[in-house]
Amino acid sequence: MSSSTSSVESVEDESCSNECSASFTFDTNNNSRGDQQVDELAEETHMKLSITPTRESFSLSQLERIVTIGKGTFGRVELARDKISGAHYALKVLNIRRVVDMRQTQHVHNEKRVLLQLKHPFIVKMYASEKDSNNLYMIMEFVPGGEMFSYLRASRSFSNSMARFYASEIVCALEYIHSLGIVYRDLKPENLMLSKEGHIKMADFGFAKELRDRTYTICGTPDYLAPESLARTGHNKGVDWWALGILIYEMMVGKPPFRGKTTAEIYDSIIEHKLKFPRSFNLAAKDLVKKLLEVDRTQRIGCMKNGTQDVKDHKWFEKVNWDDTLHLRVEVKKLIGIFLIPIFQPPIVPTLYHPGDTGNFDDYEEDTTGGPLCSQRERDLFAEW
């Protein structure tokens, strides 16, 4: 739940709302975390940072709520710790009155329903839901690496091989959710988290929707909206492939291809489709981005007869072993002395020093009020929560 880039939606219909050349470790807050002894301790404990959750049911009373790690228009995400097992979770807290006032009731129900059926290595897990008299709670996997947006902002842009690594994991995730008839509709760096090992975790499924055919309302972030969404001619999974094209471009350039000072100017830029690439942009990547940003969705790569396979078969991904990608096998060669030693490590490994480390998240003011009180009528909208 990032406030870095705003998402938009139409209020007319509430139903919407493995190759890498180098390895880097980022501390996105640029904090000094201690001396060499601390670094050595981090090295030793790196593989022990997450306690795998084993509880099939949760009670809020069993969770110690520690600190806010994300904030949105009608809710926040907090780090929480199970007092019994010691496991850490991300606790999404949604104020019922704010959800209703923002006409997000159906979105919230959609997110819960979608997340509970998703089980994939590149998608954040949801374990349980709870509610009290004023708030809804979603108990989710804590992904300690923070947002991809933070790393992209710190480095300004990613190399061709880094962008390909992350894009390949996103392709696998999109293939999976599309196979279930689900459209994501909010792909952007702020919604992509990094696991402690450095793999992608897609988060925030508030705009996700199960689709049989098309939906017609505008959902998503202005920079990432597809032309058919703006034209209200109906959209489907093609909007996710369009967004992937925007994301690849932004990863490699540092900013999205269609820009403007206002939302209206961004929309005009998308409709005019003046797509320009820096000279340094990899040619194979350029070809893929052009095919993903095809205005005619029937001719857009990923949307034709062969679906995702066309994307996987594109020449930009020719060095990707898709089975290795899906099973988190990443081989890179690191120069140690005079030898190139194969190691298994994503291009960015988050800086972490202990279980529950929140150093890769921004600081937020804590909310001690619990949000505005809600009425019984508003509570009844979530009677089955």
Curated annotation (Swiss-Prot):
GO cellular component term, pick one: cytosol
Name of the protein in its database record: cAMP-dependent protein kinase, catalytic subunit-like
Family: Belongs to the protein kinase superfamily. Ser/Thr protein kinase family. cAMP subfamily.
Pfam family, one: Pkinase
Gene Ontology MF terms: ATP binding; cAMP-dependent protein kinase activity; protein serine kinase activity
Active site: D186
Protein kinase domain sequence ranges: 63-317
Record keywords: ATP-binding, cAMP, Kinase, Nucleotide-binding, Serine/threonine-protein kinase, Transferase
Catalytic activities: L-seryl-[protein] + ATP = O-phospho-L-seryl-[protein] + ADP + H(+); L-threonyl-[protein] + ATP = O-phospho-L-threonyl-[protein] + ADP + H(+)
SMART domains: S_TKc
Entries under InterPro entries matching the protein: Kinase-like_dom_sf, Prot_kinase_dom, Protein_kinase_ATP_BS, Ser/Thr_kinase_AS
One Gene Ontology biological process: signal transduction
Record-listed E.C. numbers: 2.7.11.11
Domain AGC-kinase C-terminal residue range list: 318-385
Top-level taxon in the UniProt lineage: Eukaryota
Binding site residues for ATP: I69, G70, K71, G72, T73, F74, G75, R76, V77, K92
UniProt keyword ATP-binding present: yes
Transferase as UniProt keyword: yes
